[in-house]
């Protein structure tokens, strides 16, 4: 029996996104090693074939912002049809009681749904770390590896709870030192670099209003030190804009820049309520947007 991964011809697709691959592609160990033109056969010795005549051949889709754990509560009736802040306060107490087995189930369900829709790469933003979810990212790494998903797992965080005037219960809030220490541990343990990396880590304070300014600044510094990316929610609702102006005396993007986040290392979730000047600034900085209204 051969010890190397099999060479597979994905043969004669119904349609292909690349005309040079109208006859399919030859793959081995997760890589395309040959594109086959229409009416041709592979030059490479093939060990198995997959009949793609009823399939469309295209690159895997990429989901740039997800919350795997929320898969379990997407039909939770008390939270339906609510604006962001009331929706969050309704669900935080539910999420605070999730455990690692439930997170593993939610992550598997979310990733299988993505794979079935043609999505092979996903960025997940997990920021709920109760006592039962201390190793949430470790659980997600294991699940992603088992399913063969390329995962950019962002280590989220919340350091401002209800006792400090925030939205989440104290049971899911962590202190800044714990957040930074755990972020460092996860990067050192799991972050892969270079072509073909299947698991990468990013730092992802939940939002400007759920963490301290200190954590925003220190996360940016740690990301630069470790050469990883930054992710957070920004400009998702008008309520957020008003909250930032009241709390910080500036708009969300100005606060982002003041904390060292406005760079090409950063991509933001939502990004709905930017004015024209802010859109131009984002473009000049090379900051990405996962635009999901």
Locate the predicted segments by residue:
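Divalent metal-coordination and catalytic microenvironments
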Residues: 13, 25, 30, 54, ...
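Active-site-adjacent C-terminal substructures of enzyme catalytic domains
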Residues: 261-293
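N-terminal metal-binding scaffold of metallo-dependent hydrolase/deaminase domains
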Residues: 1-43, 55-57
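A structural motif
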Residues: 119, 149, 227, 286-287
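Metal-coordinating catalytic core of metallo-dependent amide/deamination hydrolases
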Residues: 132-271
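Alpha-helical scaffold segments that flank or form the walls of functional sites
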Residues: 74-125, 130-150, 181-195
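Histidine-centered catalytic micro-motifs
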Residues: 59-71, 229-238
